[in-house]
């Protein structure tokens, strides 16, 4: 048959239309097949897909298609993380309701998803902005409220005076509002709802052992640091002259004789009595100046309160300071500064002239010799009363016990992680299902009144508190307990609540009686492969682990973790630079599909580097991928039906075919180096072109069939077209994955590298186990070697059997 040109537009349109209503990607319930749940993190519906999205989804799709071909029952769903601030901003800018803007974006993105033939089971689609979904956010909140895991307290929040509203931490840039550059963000105290994630801090940390080997070590390290478990002691200094205790937390009680000051957080409750009005204003300015910033990134500043504290171990008085780097949310909000043995304290105390007293020396350093400061390691105590001469570890144990015996301290564990503040003064989020009654206080909305639905008619201006406060029919309700007039909560939930459990809903997306059927979760969970960016390591991936443990304790599920394996894909950059709208270098998915086709885009983002590495989008690279797909298609079409040819190359191409199958199979099962999978297919195609006239009619059909099957995970449109061209029926990715034969994949002989003075000059093939003398003789006589040794003295020959001959001459 004459070869056909590769018309990606015609091929992809043809199969796109045929697949529209097909149910190829439906997961089966209660199947006897082994299950495989593969999931890419659900996207925010921004309206358009770019090449970065395509890479993420192509990784998951390749794996899903491969697992189908290996006989698995595959669950591969997709949904939308649809609540969030961008929709409110669009409503303000364009006078479009957030719901309308969101649904338009979902429709546009879903159309592109379908265009790229990602194998999603769309019957399981969820959108977190639908009442059918966020009803269960509210249900989970009420269960946590019952268990004491949800509570309300007054807390400091970021406040922009120009916006007249609360900002999330991510909306604070260098201490200023993201909308109003140069406008410092203030800290205000507001009543906020929290989820008690700290109750699960130990579990979140300890149960990471189950994830080792399945999750990237970098993610686990980030989570360990974020949870930040510290073992130490809480010690009560006392306010000189008053006896009021000032409890400090320290991990190094062995250094307490070197404490030369006590430092309080600027919002510490004791400041109300310690500070005059001028110093209170100073402390408040400190709080405002660090709003939304990492304390480690700010210049350390402080001031003396004018008061002193008494060290309970030696009775000495030390000054009490206020400093911006001490956090109320960590430990007790008060620290003892030991500048001789802590780098941060050393920097601060040196700046303000606070004394420095060494009390620890290195184990291998004689007593009396000066210590290079700050010395932060363990060592031997000195100048520490009765504990002088003890090693740090033993001193910590004895000194903690002494504090407990004498009633001024105890051993303690503290965590860096704080309870999760979920209140947002926004419209486009899940309403928090409580009612505030003057008589009954905080009253949960009864389950049979869920969902509390967002009102459709609302004006969003971006000013003031929650827009919901301006909707009387939403706010004004009867108390469920006493029936008297009451007010509905107007805060909405952090959108991370939505994404903390969505993967469970995929297993039972249409259940109107409960979040999901536990039996379905028992079948599908844990997620076998979760895929998403490293940027989610310490928010979504911690919150989802927390939700899983709470659901386990409620009795809904039995698994301890949401995902068995996690993969974090690399970023896509464009022409060497990070893609951004401001640079104008965002590569849109639809434009790529128009120019090169969906298959080319999918293949390119997988073909250059391993998927965990950054990939650089370059148009010439996409053109190369497009040419390769064209070569494959033309080779297929001109060899159907197979021609009667010599068959001289049959053994060679069959061997290469089975080597390629072996390579791809092993990569899918282990390291996911899709780039080397695709490279091996390219090598096979190069050989097929070179030996085309020497492949028999008996072997060619096997080659073409295997080629279509190997391409199926990477290029679904082209592989399906090839499958039809060779006379096969049914979806190609539902065929059995071709098995490789280890015997057929074996080389008939070894390839020997021949070098002269360490430089490769040629390669020869010889039967395995060929004697070194014969290898050397053949190498010396080779036409490509002789020009480099003629007229020269052979000093020695280094031979590695089956691998190398290196001729050393001078």
UniProtKB/Swiss-Prot annotation:
GO BP annotation list: leucyl-tRNA aminoacylation
Known catalytic reactions: tRNA(Leu) + L-leucine + ATP = L-leucyl-tRNA(Leu) + AMP + diphosphate
Keyword Cytoplasm: yes
Taxonomic lineage from the root: Bacteria, Pseudomonadati, Acidobacteriota, Terriglobia, Bryobacterales
Keywords of this entry: Aminoacyl-tRNA synthetase, ATP-binding, Cytoplasm, Ligase, Nucleotide-binding, Protein biosynthesis
Motif ('KMSKS' region): 578-582
Pfam families: Anticodon_1 (PF08264), tRNA-synt_1 (PF00133), tRNA-synt_1_2 (PF13603), tRNA-synt_1g (PF09334)
Sequence positions that bind ATP: 581
Xref: NCBIfam families: leuS_bact
Enzyme nomenclature, EC number: 6.1.1.4
Name under which the protein is recorded: Leucine--tRNA ligase
PROSITE patterns: AA_TRNA_LIGASE_I (PS00178)
Gene: leuS
Localization annotation: Cytoplasm
